[in-house]
Amino acid sequence: MELLQQWTQQAKAALTQARQLCGDAHKFNEDAKTDLRNSIKQHQQLKELAKLTASQCTRLDSSTALIKQLLDLVQNYPTFNQLNVLHDRLESSLKRLRDCTLDPALGSEYTNLYAFVDDTALEDLKTRLRGVTDGVWNAFEKLAGLLEEDLCANYHKRLEAVSLDFLPPAYNDTAEELADLLLQVAQHYDQCSEALNIYDTLSDAEKKDLQEVLQSDSNHVPSVLTELRSGLDQTIHYFNAVQSYKSKVDSATSILEALAEELNKNQLTNQRHEAAHELMRAQTGLEIPQLAQELVQLERHYTHFAKAYTALLQEIHRRQTYENCVRSIVDEFVGRLEKEQQAEAKCRIDFFNQYGDYLPQTLWGAVTDPPLHFEIIEHQYTELPNVKVIPDKNDKKSKQREKSSTTASKR
């Protein structure tokens, strides 16, 4: 009986200690879970902030690059005269359009390719070219004063110094294990308490068996407490790892938010620079790069227009060759079909003449059907015009197509 009382007291003390250990572990684990959840969310938001900050740096880069590009273009093309080369190329393309007479077979109301050119747009382009030249150098001086080449490099350097590649600690999975250990101690205490209540009602053999079981459990309690302490140590280690992760996130947040705030303030300044740049571009001739690009695009467009017209005539000629070839094939095939149909019709007539009087009409009504035949119908959406092809001296295939077309026509 004294042993039972001793084991019960030991079990009660062990249960109190186990509850304390589990309570401490639970608190550390819950605090760690809360901090980890918040820090992970903060980490993700920080990555988005880093992307946004990088995007703002990129915008600054683009703005700086645009300013430098505009300055270079102004230096290379400071006056309207230096755009004359592009203008002359455009005029050469337009002259080719004037000299290119439209084939009458096309049925167009115009006489040459130049009739398709928008004269109003061309004159507007020339007027704009003349209008932007006078104030170029004043704009150049103002624009040069807005260029801050070291600004973006400084922001990039500070942004790259903020590392966000660290990972959160792995999840602590000792909670269920500690709960099981606490349950073992609680069950042992319950068994000891129950044994005290029923001990006097048991036989000597039952008392002996009960004492053996309780003694075995009592001997196991210290190892359970050791495991609980180990679990608490592991939870504290996990808590410290979470705090270290949280500290990294907080530190990176402090640095990056300060950088983003500063960048936003300077972005406003940069926006003012961009607004001033747009104003100068509209008023003092910074449209030169755009106008030069328009000249290049127009020259290319009208050059390709002339080439496309020549290619169109060759395409019509190619289609004529195709139609002649197909018609020749169809004519030959139709002749063969008619020959076969005539032979088949004769065979059916001969058969009917020989056996028709002896075959009842109700035996097979189709005995007098005509032979299988086909109808080939030509579908042409638009009749091809009879245009004159402008041969390409360097295009041997064009000459071969023209030769094959002539051969097919003779057929």
Curated annotation (Swiss-Prot):
Topology within the bilayer: Peripheral membrane protein
GO biological-process terms attached to the record: autophagosome assembly; macroautophagy; mitophagy; pexophagy; piecemeal microautophagy of the nucleus
Keywords: Autophagy, Cytoplasm, Membrane
InterPro entries (alphabetical): Atg17 (IPR007240), ATG17-like_dom (IPR045326)
GO molecular function annotations of the record: molecular adaptor activity; protein kinase activator activity
Signal sequence residues: none
Compositionally biased residues, Basic and acidic residues: 390-404
Disruption phenotype: Impairs atg8-processing.
Domain of life the protein comes from: Eukaryota
Region feature Disordered, mapped onto this chain: 388-411
Gene Ontology terms: cellular component: Atg1/ULK1 kinase complex; phagophore assembly site; phagophore assembly site membrane
Pfam families: ATG17_like
Location in or out of the cell: Cytoplasm; Preautophagosomal structure membrane
Subunit structure: Homodimer. Component of the atg1 kinase complex composed of at least atg1, atg13, atg17 and atg101. Interacts directly with atg13.
Entry function: Autophagy-specific protein that functions in response to autophagy-inducing signals as a scaffold to recruit other ATG proteins to organize preautophagosomal structure (PAS) formation. Modulates the timing and magnitude of the autophagy response, such as the size of the sequestering vesicles. Plays particularly a role in pexophagy and nucleophagy.
Similarity comment text for this entry: Belongs to the ATG17 family.
Name of this chain's protein: Autophagy-related protein 17
Source species of the chain: Schizosaccharomyces pombe (strain 972 / ATCC 24843)
Lineage, highest ranks first: Eukaryota, Fungi, Dikarya, Ascomycota, Taphrinomycotina
